[in-house]
């Protein structure tokens, strides 16, 4: 993947200012609420029976934060994202049996939550960079499935 200087700057800036404790839980909660079939991978998280329960679930919040810290690894290794996520790809495919389409659903939710947080600062150029970055991560996480 080729990254322009502008894309690198946008991605680095967004993640350096991102409140992981806010964005992570909101993004994962949104994914579990909007796409309820994704909940099957989180059966050990306790009560996920409705939106209120999901939004208040400490395990969901903690995993959302963990996901964003995982994305931070990609930000720091933008030139080698596939290798950065090789072990996670194996874990999610061979042990957890996560449907790889779920990575795309979560990336869409991350984009929505970041856009809502940034407001008008989330320009089309910003969106393009964010979605490109997340698409590369999603592809890397799905490598083991192919």
Swiss-Prot record:
PROSITE patterns: GLOBIN. One of its GO terms (cellular component) is haptoglobin-hemoglobin complex. The keyword Heme applies. It comes from the Eukaryota. Coiled coil: none annotated. One of its GO terms (biological process) is hydrogen peroxide catabolic process. One of its GO terms (molecular function) is metal ion binding. It holds the Pfam family Globin. Residues 2-146 form the Globin domain. Red blood cells. Keywords: Heme, Iron, Metal-binding, Oxygen transport, Transport. Heme b binds at residues 63, 92. InterPro entries: Globin, Globin-like_sf, Globin/Proto, Hemoglobin_b, Hemoglobin_oxygen_transport. Belongs to the globin family. Involved in oxygen transport from gills to the various peripheral tissues. This fish has two hemoglobins: Hb1 and Hb2. Hb1 is a tetramer of two alpha-2 chains and two beta chains, while Hb2 is a tetramer of two alpha-2 chains and two beta chains. This is Hemoglobin subunit beta. It comes from Notothenia angustata (Rockcod). The gene is hbb.
